[in-house]
């Protein structure tokens, strides 16, 4: 009987401890679930995944056909996280983000960027890649009047959090060797830095046009999640040039007196 009472006492103590003592899970990781179902493995892969935390944690992976899954699962520390997924950066990608070499177009880069708070046992987010480049197509009504075009600006890529980064950007196009009717430049998402179009005419004169002013007057929004493409028409006249900026739905005509 004494042995039986002793066992009951021990059992009661275990129940009491199990109910009153809570496990401290502060040191346990948070499980991050990234829903990748919206990604296009055919046209957009491979994908570069970067996860960075406030306390120095880093996780990097390349997702391609061989290792791609609809849901990516990563154990992360319980703190603030910056999560990045890149597509289309190619050889321009490095540990600091994406850098566009001088003289090159921006690559067709798509970026998912999220700030997440991993403060529980798990956290989920849907990865949706956003278009971070603008195709600027320039048509010249009198191609014989122009030798070359150069687009230049002050954004030369993206930092590791996917924000436009400062640097010298310049792309040159020899009009005589391009397929008419248009020449296309690929521009990265912009910040407040100006953008210029240098036009070298057949007589050797170089004329510079403030593209940033024209694009702003047109109402173009560089902060949109997915950037629109633009079309520009240059029509040289005896007294100047008429610049027409067009998108799918809008048109702006600017007369510049030279």
Region locations from a protein language model:
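Extracytoplasmic cysteine-anchoring/structural motifs
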Residues: 19-258
